[in-house]
Every structure is written in C-alpha cells, then in structure tokens.
C-alpha cells in the first residue's frame, strides 16, 4: 500500500463529491488519470521533488496538463501543490475509482490467465463473482504466461488462485514441510 493513501483519501473524496454534484464523474476520473500519469514522468518527478514555490509548481504542472484539466481540475492541482501533495495524485485516482465503484455498486475484478479467455468463460466468471460479491463486476483481463494454465481472480482483498502455478507452489510448500 502506498505511503500517500491516507493523504489521498480526503482529496479523492472532495473531488468525487464535487464530480457527483456536477454530474461529471467520468470527466473527473479522466482528469485525475491524466494528472496521475504526469506525476510519473521523470522530469515532472524531479520538479515535484525540487524546491519550487508551490505556485510555480502548480502552474508548471497545469501547463503540462494543458486542456486535459478544466478550471476545477486546475483548482485541485493548485490546492494539492500548495499543500505539497502532488505526488499523491496516483493514490487520489485510486481512491476516486474506489469511491466510484462503491457508489455504482460495482467491483473491479482482475482475471489473470495464461491465454485469452472466451466470452463464455468470462460470462461464467462474471456471474459467479457477481453472486459471490453481491454486486455488479467489471472484469479486467490480463494475460500472464507464468500462470501456466487456469486463472487467478482478484477482487479487493480476495484472491482465488486456480492456476497451475499456484497449485505447484502449494504442492512445493507441502513437500517442504
């Protein structure tokens, strides 16, 4: 877990509440995603770690973001820069997405497999996870050859490891004990 998660939570909540009130949740998520990516840029990371005045840092950051930020998004950047919190933007995005998922009664579910899954397989996984979590799910499918076969399903703190790799690891643990 990131060191900025506690710092990010109030900014994410404020941004989310504002976005809901102004019916612009999708736009805000896009703005936060772009701003979070900007913080990952090597040159911007140096600026964020430097000794620039908050006003200068905020204006530089806003200039880099260009038209990707509306006036309200720019105001959030200014407040975060003033408080020395721009490095927390990736965590603000993460918390914003979490608040949106809770609000929309959806859950992000990562499905990791060795090969692409068929629509039928994805539908079965989706139905099973919706039943288990009692909410709608959004599947994020990833391919990882190291899984070998089977799938790994992650939803929040829950992990269901039905992969061959996981079974081999568990077997190795049993044999070593």
From Swiss-Prot:
<keyword id="KW-0375">Hydrogen ion transport</keyword>
<keyword id="KW-0139">CF(1)</keyword>
<keyword id="KW-0472">Membrane</keyword>
<comment type="similarity">
    <text>Belongs to the ATPase delta chain family.</text>
</comment>
<dbReference type="InterPro" id="IPR000711">
    <property type="entry name" value="ATPase_OSCP/dsu"/>
</dbReference>
<dbReference type="GO" id="GO:0005886">
    <property type="term" value="C:plasma membrane"/>
</dbReference>
<dbReference type="InterPro" id="IPR026015">
    <property type="entry name" value="ATP_synth_OSCP/delta_N_sf"/>
</dbReference>
<keyword id="KW-1003">Cell membrane</keyword>
<keyword id="KW-0066">ATP synthesis</keyword>
<protein>
    <recommendedName>
        <fullName>ATP synthase subunit delta</fullName>
    </recommendedName>
</protein>
<comment type="function">
    <text>F(1)F(0) ATP synthase produces ATP from ADP in the presence of a proton or sodium gradient. F-type ATPases consist of two structural domains, F(1) containing the extramembraneous catalytic core and F(0) containing the membrane proton channel, linked together by a central stalk and a peripheral stalk. During catalysis, ATP synthesis in the catalytic domain of F(1) is coupled via a rotary mechanism of the central stalk subunits to proton translocation.</text>
</comment>
<dbReference type="GO" id="GO:0045259">
    <property type="term" value="C:proton-transporting ATP synthase complex"/>
</dbReference>
<comment type="function">
    <text>This protein is part of the stalk that links CF(0) to CF(1). It either transmits conformational changes from CF(0) to CF(1) or is implicated in proton conduction.</text>
</comment>
<keyword id="KW-0813">Transport</keyword>
<dbReference type="InterPro" id="IPR020781">
    <property type="entry name" value="ATPase_OSCP/d_CS"/>
</dbReference>
<dbReference type="GO" id="GO:0046933">
    <property type="term" value="F:proton-transporting ATP synthase activity, rotational mechanism"/>
</dbReference>
<comment type="subunit">
    <text>F-type ATPases have 2 components, F(1) - the catalytic core - and F(0) - the membrane proton channel. F(1) has five subunits: alpha(3), beta(3), gamma(1), delta(1), epsilon(1). F(0) has three main subunits: a(1), b(2) and c(10-14). The alpha and beta chains form an alternating ring which encloses part of the gamma chain. F(1) is attached to F(0) by a central stalk formed by the gamma and epsilon chains, while a peripheral stalk is formed by the delta and b chains.</text>
</comment>
<dbReference type="Pfam" id="PF00213">
    <property type="entry name" value="OSCP"/>
</dbReference>
<keyword id="KW-0406">Ion transport</keyword>
<keyword id="KW-0997">Cell inner membrane</keyword>
């Amino acid at each position: 877990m990131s060191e900025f998660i506690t710092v990010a939570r109030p900014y994410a909540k404020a941004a989310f509440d504002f976005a809901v009130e102004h019916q612009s949740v999708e736009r805000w998520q896009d703005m936060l995603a772009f701003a979070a990516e900007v913080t990952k840029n090597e040159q911007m990371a140096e600026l964020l770690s430097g000794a620039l005045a908050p006003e200068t840092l905020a204006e530089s950051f806003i200039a880099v973001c260009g038209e990707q930020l509306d006036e309200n998004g720019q105001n959030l950047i200014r407040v975060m820069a003033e408080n020395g919190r721009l490095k927390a933007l990736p965590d603000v995005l993460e918390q914003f997405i979490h608040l949106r998922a809770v609000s929309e009664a959806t859950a992000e579910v990562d499905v990791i497999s060795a090969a692409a899954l068929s629509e039928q397989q994805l539908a079965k996984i989706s139905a099973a996870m919706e039943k288990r979590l009692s909410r709608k799910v959004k599947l994020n499918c990833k391919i990882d050859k190291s899984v070998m076969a089977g799938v790994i399903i992650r939803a929040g703190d829950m992990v269901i490891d039905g992969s061959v790799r996981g079974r081999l690891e568990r077997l190795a643990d049993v044999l070593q004990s």
